[in-house]
């Protein structure tokens, strides 16, 4: 491991430039027209606490190289965690053997790309004692557990990762990046007889241990406890078709899942998305502008470059209801005859990259949350969203409402639980009739064909004129 880093002109690199060049040329030896190396060296810590006791603490390191080759629209991918010269050349040649043809390149001149740094880090987690990390977890546990006697279980997780990457390709790109992320997870369980309800909060940022100077650990833990306790004492949500107000922050998970994946070139290029071929068409209410922006400083889903080495950027997906763009990676960009948008991501070197979201959100509108509620005769107010499922080809979704309330005559009447939102993403976009100005985001992990990656989801409070709500009670 000590030999991973090599001093090249301009500093230390994960691989020597001469080796990078030789591996790329080997990968192209059978007619490939593009080859890429992705190397990473990642360290991380994961600590789990249950009811104030540390159950597990793991620190580890993972490193390896992924080699990808294109020939037209074909793609071959291979990876290894043996980074010595002989093995890397062997893996490159084995991957190349899947293709046939004469070499198209015999020489590559690598040009170092200097990237803008959107995500400064002040306190590297590796330099912070484990006792300090556990101390943060204990504070969260005490705040949640002490909120009320109905809180019967509190689970806390702490996570930090420090990923170094090197990306080089046959177009001459050579770039390195470092991504440090820190996150706290709080899950509170409230009990009432045989009934149990849980609530989760998971603040995280693309930053170091200074995260805990930016968030109020105790207040977040208390909010999780409050939500769980409110829901265990709540009545069941009524079923039917009626307006739904979806609150800001993690409410954006519906757009992310039901619409965002359909705007990734992975599905668009195959015609497997309801948004395929609709650039320039109205796909949402004129109140809706939606963006994917990987450049927001220190946001959970931000990166200086994507996992193909393209600089991240602000991608406007929908503007005033009109479809303006997609999230595009290199391979699907070829298929669509469109340029990459800095949207290609992967969990690790073990995955070939593809188009994925970074920080995706519906932009702020002109109303206030209070105006939306006061102007609504009857609705379900979804304050926090839970898990769900989506068919990416159709945008059909099914999402649990983790914390809900009935709005009646312009006022929040009572809490309700067990509600489920059922619909089709593109139809819901058309039915958004009020958008507040209180844009906020929540953090999550998004799973897809290139693995699990950190993403921000966000929106202001919005009102949808009608959604099918699944519940245990008849309509009120």
Model-derived regions, located:
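N-terminal small-residue-enriched
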Residues: 1-476
């Amino acid at each position: 491991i000590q030999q991973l880093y090599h001093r090249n002109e301009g500093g230390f690199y994960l691989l020597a430039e001469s080796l990078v060049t030789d591996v790329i040329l080997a990968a192209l030896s059978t007619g490939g027209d593009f080859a890429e190396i992705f190397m990473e060296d990642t360290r991380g810590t994961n600590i789990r606490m249950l009811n104030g006791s540390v159950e597990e603490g793991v620190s580890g390191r993972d490193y390896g190289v992924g080699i990808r080759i294109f020939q037209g629209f074909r793609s071959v991918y291979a990876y290894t965690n043996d980074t010595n010269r002989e093995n890397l050349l062997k893996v490159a040649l084995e991957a190349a053997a899947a293709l046939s043809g004469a070499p198209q390149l015999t020489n590559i001149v690598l040009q170092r790309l200097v990237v803008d740094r959107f995500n400064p880090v002040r306190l590297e987690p590796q330099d912070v004692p484990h006792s300090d990390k556990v101390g943060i977890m204990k504070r969260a546990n005490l705040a949640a557990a002490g909120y009320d006697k109905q809180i019967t279980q509190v689970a806390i997780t702490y996570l930090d990762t420090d990923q170094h990457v090197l990306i080089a390709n046959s177009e001459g790109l050579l770039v390195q990046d470092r991504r440090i992320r820190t996150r706290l997870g709080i899950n509170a369980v409230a009990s009432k007889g045989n009934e149990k309800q849980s609530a989760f909060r998971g603040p995280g940022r693309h930053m170091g241990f200074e995260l805990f100077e930016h968030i109020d650990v105790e207040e977040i833990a208390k909010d999780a406890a409050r939500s769980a306790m409110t829901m265990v004492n709540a009545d069941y949500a009524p079923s039917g078709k009626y307006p739904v107000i979806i609150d800001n922050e993690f409410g954006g998970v519906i757009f992310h899942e039901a619409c965002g994946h359909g705007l990734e070139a992975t599905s668009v290029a195959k015609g497997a998305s309801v948004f395929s071929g609709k650039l320039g068409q109205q796909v949402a209410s004129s109140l809706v502008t939606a963006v994917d922006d990987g450049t927001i400083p220190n946001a959970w889903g931000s990166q200086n470059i994507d996992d193909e080495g393209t600089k991240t950027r602000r991608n406007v997906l929908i503007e005033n209801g009109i479809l303006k763009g997609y999230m595009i990676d290199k391979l699907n960009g070829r298929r669509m005859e469109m340029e990459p948008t800095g949207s290609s991501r992967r969990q690790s070197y073990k995955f070939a990259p593809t188009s994925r979201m970074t920080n995706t959100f519906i932009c702020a509108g002109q109303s206030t949350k209070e105006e939306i509620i006061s102007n609504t005769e009857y609705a379900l107010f979804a304050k926090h969203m839970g898990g769900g499922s989506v068919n990416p080809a159709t945008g059909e979704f099914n999402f649990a409402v983790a914390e809900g309330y009935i709005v009646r005559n312009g006022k929040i009447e009572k809490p309700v639980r067990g509600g489920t939102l059922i619909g089709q993403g593109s139809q819901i976009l058309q039915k958004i009739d009020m958008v507040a100005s209180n844009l906020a985001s929540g953090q999550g992990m998004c799973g897809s064909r290139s693995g699990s990656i950190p993403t921000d989801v966000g929106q202001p409070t919005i009102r949808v004129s009608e959604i099918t709500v699944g519940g245990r009670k008849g309509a009120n």
